[in-house]
Amino acid sequence: MACVFVMALAIVFLAPGIWKAYERSSLAIAAANIRQLSAGGAQYLAENNYRYWKFRENGATSIDAGGNPVVGTRYWFGYESNGSASAGEGHRSFDASQGPLAGYVPKGIHPDPSFATHASAFKPKFKCGYLGIGYNVVLGGGWSPGPKTKTMSYWQLSDPGKVVVFTTCAQVNNFQSPASTSHPMLEEFYGIDQNEKTVHFRAGKVAMVGFADGSASFLPMDESTRDNRIKGVDIGRFAPVGSFKYLK
């Protein structure tokens, strides 16, 4: 299965000045990714009655490289076969050309190098790179919408300029090997909602966001939501757990 996103840079020990350069390049890459995703998302809405795409579709069918039918999951960022899902963390793969935004988003989406700075504390999910961007699951019908689930319409939003569609994203994992309760690890993640702590405030303690009106900005963390399981990793939420602020 093709991987559109190239592998991230190898993890090496670098001087503080070079880590700063990594941070700057991460900011530029996140900005470019969110800008392109936002533009592609706007085109998708215009051609689909202004209704948002699903976060995921279970039991989605596809054709593999050999022309054989396969079953898997179509996430907002690409398609993963059931065979890939059973390959184990860090060995999974997905095909971005079969995601709902394929054809709307240019192929210049790049992996975010900031994950490499966390060295042994980072656990990759896929072998084909680290997008580092999450989609608003509230817009996309929930984490696992059914075939008849309706996603939100753009016209349902009370103030599109204050509704986040995309943001820098990651989570702390302590339940999938090699992570554990005694060794929590940072991993790439792909969605935000009203309950989970999955916003990654990696741009100088703020998160980069793309709003529903097409604008982009930065938002700070609500400190009451900070995930303290990994020192120096800024994971949390924009608003208290249970709040739909910035979500609809």
Regions found by a protein language model. Give the residues of each.
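Amphipathic alpha-helical segments typified by the pilin-like N-terminal helix
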Residues: M1-A32
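Short, well-structured segments within or immediately adjacent to enzyme catalytic domains
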Residues: A30-K248
